[in-house]
C-alpha cells in the first residue's frame, strides 16, 4: 500500500527557486507565500499542520540521504517553526506549525547549526569514499549512504572485512584531503555531457531524475552526481573520524563516520 501523500490537490505552481544551491551558507531570506496546504499524510512531524510553498527558499528538502532543514518562517502577522522540509515534484514544501496567507511576504531563517552539521557529514561521506577507493582499489563503490546531524554512514563494496588499521589509513587520508584541498567544485551539466565527460561512476549515489545533473567534485579525489548541500571549502569540516565498520551483507562494509 502506497503511503498517503503529504498534501492533497497540490496546485500548479512555478518551481521553487533553490537558494541553497546559489549560496550554501545563506541563512536568512525573504520570500512570497504561493500556497498554504493542510498536511494529511502519514510521515508528518508531530506539531506540523501546514505545508508552505514559497517562490524561493534556503531550506534544503530531504533527499539524497540528507535530512531536510529546520528553522522558522515569520511575517508581520504570524511566526511558525519549520519542523522538516520535503520535495514534492518541483516544489519545496516547508512543514510548518501553522498557516500563512497566500501572498504573505515571509522572512525565513535556517537552523544553521543543524544544517552545518548535515553539510559536515555529507561532504565527509564523499571524502571518505574517495579515500577508500584510493587506498583499497577501484572496485570500491558506494552501495548506500545516510547523513544525519550526529553522524553519517557509508556502505562500500569490498571483498573482505576492514581492519582497524584499514579504517585508520582511510581516516588519515580523508583528513589530508580536508587540509590540502582548498575548494570543492559544484557544477550543473546536461546528463549526456556529464555521462560523456565522467562516465557512469558519477551515479554511485543513484542516478538523479531530470536532464540536468548537479555534480560535486573534490579535486581529483572524488566526483559524483549529488544534489545535497556541501561546504565550499573542505577545511570547514574540521576533522573526520571513522568510528567503526560492520558488515551489512557479504561484500558490503558500513563505515560509521563522525565529522565536525
Predicted regions and their residues:
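A glycine- and charged-residue-rich anion-binding loop/surface
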Residues: 1-260
Amino acid at each position: 500500500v502506497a503511503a498517503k501523500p503529504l498534501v492533497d490537490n497540490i496546485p500548479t505552481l512555478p518551481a521553487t527557486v533553490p537558494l541553497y544551491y546559489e549560496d550554501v551558507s545563506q541563512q536568512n531570506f525573504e520570500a512570497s507565500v504561493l500556497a498554504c496546504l493542510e498536511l494529511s499524510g502519514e510521515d508528518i512531524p508531530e506539531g506540523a499542520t501546514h505545508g508552505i510553498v514559497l517562490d524561493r527558499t534556503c531550506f534544503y528538502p530531504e533527499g539524497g540521504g540528507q535530512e531536510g532543514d529546520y528553522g522558522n518562517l515569520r511575517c508581520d502577522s504570524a511566526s511558525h517553526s519549520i519542523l522538516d522540509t520535503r520535495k514534492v515534484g518541483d516544489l519545496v514544501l516547508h512543514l510548518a506549525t501553522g498557516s500563512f496567507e497566500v501572498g504573505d511576504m515571509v522572512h525565513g531563517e535556517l537552523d544553521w547549526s543543524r544544517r552545518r552539521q548535515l553539510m559536515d557529514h555529507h561532504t565527509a561521506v564523499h571524502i571518505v569514499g574517495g579515500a577508500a577507493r584510493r587506498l583499497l582499489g577501484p572496485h570500491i563503490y558506494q552501495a548506500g549512504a545516510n547523513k544525519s546531524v550526529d553522524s553519517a554512514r557509508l556502505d562500500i563494496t569490498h571483498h573482505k572485512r576492514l581492519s582497524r588499521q584499514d579504517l585508520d589509513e582511510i581516516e588519515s587520508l580523508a583528513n589530508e584531503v580536508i587540509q590540502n584541498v582548498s575548494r570543492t567544485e559544484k557544477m550543473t551539466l546536461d546528463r549526456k555531457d556529464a555521462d560523456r565527460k565522467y562516465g557512469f561512476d558519477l551515479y554511485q549515489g543513484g542516478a538523479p531524475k531530470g536532464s540536468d545533473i548537479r555534480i560535486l567534485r573534490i579535486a581529483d579525489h572524488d566526483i559524483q552526481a549529488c544534489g545535497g548541500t556541501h561546504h565550499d571549502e573542505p577545511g570547514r569540516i574540521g576533522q573526520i573520524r571513522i568510528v567503526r565498520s560492520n558488515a551489512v551483507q557479504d561484500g558490503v562494509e558500513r563505515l560509521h563516520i563522525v565529522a565536525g
